[in-house]
């Protein structure tokens, strides 16, 4: 059964400007520790941040909280399996909300072009 659905689209230039203005401090505010390592190893690009930001926004919508009730950007982590397929890992208040909803799977689809990054999340119970 579907517990929640969320989607988001982000203009890459928006994250590019934030990165230029605030440097890595901006990335540290939105990325979980492992994501931050991947960001650094991958060349610290705005496109990377845009994909992560879109995924986290979509996930917060699927949880039904947005970024309230203690859910933060760093509570939502994008991970990849051995084939490169993305999924979500929940921490802190986001994990508590996922448990309360009975989430057993968090499906994530990411797509990006030069100008935009898009994410779609489906939370499944059972």
Swiss-Prot record:
It holds the Pfam family ACPS. It comes from the Bacteria. Mg(2+) binds at residues 8, 57. GO terms for biological process: fatty acid biosynthetic process. InterPro entries: 4-PPantetheinyl_Trfase_dom, 4-PPantetheinyl_Trfase_dom_sf, ACPS, Ppantetheine-prot_Trfase_dom. GO terms for cellular component: cytoplasm. Its cofactor is Mg(2+). It catalyses: apo-[ACP] + CoA = holo-[ACP] + adenosine 3',5'-bisphosphate + H(+). The keyword Metal-binding applies. Its EC number is 2.7.8.7. SUPFAM superfamilies: 4'-phosphopantetheinyl transferase. It is an enzyme of class 2 (transferase). Disulfide bonds: none annotated. GO terms for molecular function: holo-[acyl-carrier-protein] synthase activity; magnesium ion binding. Coiled coil: none annotated. It is found in: Cytoplasm. Keywords: Cytoplasm, Fatty acid biosynthesis, Fatty acid metabolism, Lipid biosynthesis, Lipid metabolism, Magnesium, Metal-binding, Transferase. Belongs to the P-Pant transferase superfamily. AcpS family. Transfers the 4'-phosphopantetheine moiety from coenzyme A to a Ser of acyl-carrier-protein. NCBIfam families: acpS, pantethn_trn. This is Holo-[acyl-carrier-protein] synthase. It comes from Halorhodospira halophila (strain DSM 244 / SL1) (Ectothiorhodospira halophila (strain DSM 244 / SL1)). The gene is acpS.
